[in-house]
Regions:
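Repetitive helical segments and hydrophobic/amphipathic motifs
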Residues: 11-14
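Short beta-strand elements of solenoid repeat domains
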Residues: 50-53, 60, 73-76, 83, ...
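N-terminal segments that cap or nucleate solenoid repeat domains
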Residues: 21-58, 371-374
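Conserved anchor residues at repeat-unit boundaries in beta-strand-based tandem repeats, strongest
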Residues: 35-45, 58-69, 81-92, 104-115, ...
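Bacterial N-terminal signal peptides that target proteins for export
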Residues: 1-8
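N-terminal signal peptide c-region/cleavage motif recognized by signal peptidases
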Residues: 16-18
């Protein structure tokens, strides 16, 4: 600042006489110890001037009635600097602030805080442009990370909050609702492999009801918990197979019905994506098995109803009749004996419809070794 120039100008006015008591160039000391030199009016800073504060801070710019007002530059002893508009000793209007960490803000201010539209260039290469309130990202804005990720949408207290769209560096993207920086509420996430989830979220994980579209044509619609299919849902395969029932941790688990495209149906218990527990299986040809299952095969006790009218009731192992069992034919004839790997194996008794024994004998690997008619 050229104090001499100010002095000459003021002296010229003083010669004129009218402003003798109004304008001057001089020195003023504030109550906080700050020292001012520059234009004065009624013995207070007014116009252009410079103030040096006891802690080393310095302001150079315009004053009005003893307060910073108009254009000015504030340099702090910690290395931060503000260049812009002031009103009643506060940053207000448009201005640029340089932070010690090399962040730079350009935009609107109100009562010493970033308020309105502005742009922040962060030291790490990130950028934000949008609305601010109380020196935080609040309202609509766009944040671009140095790595290439982009979020455009609503903010609250520096966090993604409200409706917005995020695109990650790998190309995956989410569009929907946010809360406290998390995906929360309803939204759609598209994966890089083409998969897509549309539904409810809770603190960044799929939680609630949703639909997941797989890039291979599979589809799941139902309940989620902690990003896993958990609860009731329907899983559809591109070949026409359908499972409807309970899920746990992403797998068919609980009670459910699986319908194959070829017409076969299973209804019963599942565990870890397999038929486990009590269940009923209907083949496409009409045969029916009802009983215990283990690892997708009939295992334990059960009944096998054949389309020819015969019924087997007894033990199963690895999907075949194994152990003690009874076959009841359509005409009422009953075979009681041992089975092994789906074949008659061991001693047997055969009865007629009235329960009378009509034959006994022995089978080996499905072959009759001997018999005795009664």
């Amino acid at each position: 600042m050229n104090v001499l120039k100010y002095g000459m100008a003021i002296c010229a006015m003083m010669i004129c006489g009218a402003a003798e008591a109004q304008l001057s160039v001089g020195y003023y000391k504030f109550k906080n110890g700050a020292e001012y030199s520059g234009e004065l009016k009624r013995r207070k800073p007014n116009g252009m001037g410079r103030t040096v504060y006891p802690n080393g801070d310095m302001y150079e710019g315009q004053y009005l009635k003893g307060k910073r007002d108009g254009q000015g530059t504030m340099m702090l002893n910690i290395g931060e600097r503000y260049i812009g508009e002031w009103k009643e000793d506060m940053k207000q209007g448009e201005g640029t602030y340089y932070f010690t960490n090399n962040n730079m803000y350009v935009g609107a201010w109100e009562q010493d805080q970033q308020e309105g539209k502005g742009k922040m260039d962060y030291f790490n290469g990130d950028k934000y442009e949008g609305e601010w309130s109380k020196s935080k990202r609040n309202g609509q804005g766009k944040y671009v990370w140095a790595g290439g990720a982009v979020y455009e949408g609503h903010w609250k207290n520096d966090l993604k909050d409200g409706s917005g769209k995020m695109i990650w560096e790998d190309g995956s993207q989410y569009e929907g609702h946010w809360k406290n920086g998390f995906r929360h509420g309803k939204g759609t996430f598209t994966y890089t492999n083409g998969d897509k989830y549309t539904g409810e979220w809770k603190e960044d994980v799929q939680d609630g009801k949703g639909v997941y579209y797989f890039h291979n044509g599979e589809k799941y619609e139902g309940e989620y918990a902690n990003s896993e299919r958990t609860g009731k849902g329907v899983y559809t395969y591109p070949n026409g197979d359908i499972y409807e029932g309970e899920f746990k941790n992403g797998k068919q688990d609980g009670q459910g019905v699986f319908k194959w495209a070829n017409g076969a149906v299973y209804e019963g218990a599942w565990r870890d994506n397999e038929r486990n527990g009590q269940g009923k299986y209907i083949w496409a040809n009409g045969d029916v098995y009802e009983g215990e299952w283990k690892h997708n095969m009939a295992e334990g006790t059960g009944k096998l109803f054949m389309t020819d009218g015969s019924v087997y009731e007894g033990s199963f192992e690895r999907g075949k009749e194994h152990g003690k069992g009874v076959i009841k034919e359509k005409d009422g004839t009953v075979f009681e004996g041992e089975f092994k790997n789906g074949k008659k194996d061991g001693d047997f008794v055969e009865k007629d419809a009235s329960g009378k024994i009509i034959r006994t004998g022995t089978f080996k690997n499905g072959r009759l070794l001997d018999d005795k008619k009664m």
